Amino acid sequence: MRCLPVFVILLLLIASAPSVDAQPKTKDDVPLAPLHDNIRSTLQTLRKKVCCRPVQDCCSGK
């Protein structure tokens, strides 16, 4: 029973320790922000091609 509080405190300290990247960055690493922007613009283009017809009003920003 004496070890339980010590064990809990150690677990809390380990959980709050700053994490370290397991692999160092290389020059080939690409930031994810430009990839998300590309995906977003591609999805917008596809949405316009699929649902922007005169009968449908999905292009109005709804």
Swiss-Prot record:
Residues 23-49 form a propeptide. It holds the Pfam family Chi-conotoxin. The lineage of its organism: Eukaryota, Metazoa, Spiralia, Lophotrochozoa, Mollusca. Residues 1-22 form the signal peptide. Belongs to the conotoxin T superfamily. This is Conotoxin Gm5.2. Its main location: secreted. Transmembrane segments: none annotated. The keyword Lyase does not apply. The modification Serine amide is found at residue 60. It comes from the Eukaryota. Expressed by the venom duct. The cysteine framework is V (CC-CC). GO terms for molecular function: toxin activity. GO terms for cellular component: extracellular region. It is found in: Secreted. Keywords: Amidation, Cleavage on pair of basic residues, Disulfide bond, Secreted, Signal, Toxin. Contains 2 disulfide bonds that can be either 'C1-C3, C2-C4' or 'C1-C4, C2-C3', since these disulfide connectivities have been observed for conotoxins with cysteine framework V (for examples, see AC P0DQQ7 and AC P81755). InterPro entries: T-conotoxin.
